[in-house]
């Protein structure tokens, strides 16, 4: 019995082309294309072209069993053609071939739908002043960077609750909607900030120093502040002529969260106390003593001062 070869559909193999989309971009049938080799084109009947195959493709979710069986539908029996698909990888398969004269086999390719970039808005400053409390740094996803009806939040915000003085990086990590990624295709968004020392509560002292003593021996009164007071130059020795001169004093708080501050402090110079004693002297009756000598019995001279610098005269007030 003769066989009518025209009743047997001709088998033609084509290759689906891989494609890439971003989440939110519409996928149309025109986006899904294929290639056919010259050897396969030769199998076309006279007068037919590639368009004569009436071939359309579809993109569907990847299920291993579907690929092996050649199914052209997803798990629910639907495809995503013309709809928003979640970010991920899809397989491009045969949808329909309207020309029954051909048995069209489509070698599948992948459609990669990449995540859409979401913009982050920081409610934060670059610098803060120490208060002992967290700075209140927040990070949110800009609503206008999302598709309509989509919602997306930051999964975790780390290192934003610092309270001590220092330089830090707040980290926004991950997004609750897997279809989105931080701008720049990053997994983490960073905000750099620093907490600066605060002004301390301090009252600088009243200072007195005895003539000839260095500021190291100065007496301070009336100071307040949880820290250390010191002169910028505590070796300075002031003279009476410099009474009430301004000297730079530095206050360093014990708590490093507060600033070290300086102030010009007036210094009162007090006279140096000395006790002198006239030397014992004897004379014969009728003899005149023109100069009486003396010595320091209590106290000492300052620096390079000499006895004659004191310009003290001792006189006899009674006796012959």
Model-derived regions, located:
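Solvent-exposed beta-strand/loop surfaces, strongest in extracytoplasmic domains of secreted
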Residues: 1-320
